Amino acid sequence: MAEFPSKVNTRTSSPAQGGGAVVSTLSPDLGFVRSSLGALMLLQLVLGLLVWALIADTPYHLYPSYGWVMFVAVFLWLVTIIFFVLYLFQLHMKLYMVPWPLVLMVFNVGATVLYITAFITCSASVELTSLKGSQPYNQRAAASFFSCLVMIAYGVSAFLSFQAWRGVGSNAATSQMAGGYA
């Protein structure tokens, strides 16, 4: 058996100037905003805001169907803001262990399905809940139209994120380094 050495050399050192803290500044990636993914996210944010603002301006709480539309619109709007900020400031690059193309594809497919149900619910409830030609009728009809548009925007995003996840048109090694957006 080896014995414990009788003499051990130790060395102490003082911390570096400034405490060793790393400070990095967040700077927006304007290339992301110009990309198809960034432009679609901005479109989803604007259209989603229109949907829930139009519904919120009516007495939607009296009708459960509009409660569902509000839930879908507000929830997906907030999650889209989170994804937009993550990609705009390249925070997704710091969380490299997360498969972002897959996460984005699953989110966009789920958002498309939820907006399909919200669009059907909203458009089917317009005539049942308000008088034709009244302000609530017009607002709910406009919300139905914009929910259809945002549903299409999420569908296009789902298709593009599926292609990014599969690696169509890019090398798998460079797609992670390029930020993962087209």
From Swiss-Prot:
Residues 1-35, 90-99, 163-182 are cytoplasmic. This is Plasmolipin. The chain crosses the membrane at residues 36-56, 69-89, 100-120, 142-162. The keyword Transmembrane helix applies. Residues 1-20 are annotated as: Disordered. Its main location: membrane. Phosphorylated. Belongs to the MAL family. It is found in: Cell membrane; Myelin membrane; Apical cell membrane. InterPro entries: MAL, Marvel, MARVEL-CKLF_proteins. Forms oligomers. It comes from Bos taurus (Bovine). Main component of the myelin sheath that plays an important role in myelin membrane biogenesis and myelination. Plays an essential function in apical endocytosis. Regulates epithelial development through the regulation of apical endocytosis. Part of the intracellular machinery that mediates basolateral-to-apical transport of ICAM-1, an essential adhesion receptor in epithelial cells, from the subapical compartment in hepatic epithelial cells. Residues 57-68, 121-141 are extracellular. Residues 7-16 have a biased composition (Polar residues). The keyword Membrane applies. GO terms for biological process: myelination; regulation of endocytosis. Keywords: Cell membrane, Membrane, Transmembrane, Transmembrane helix.
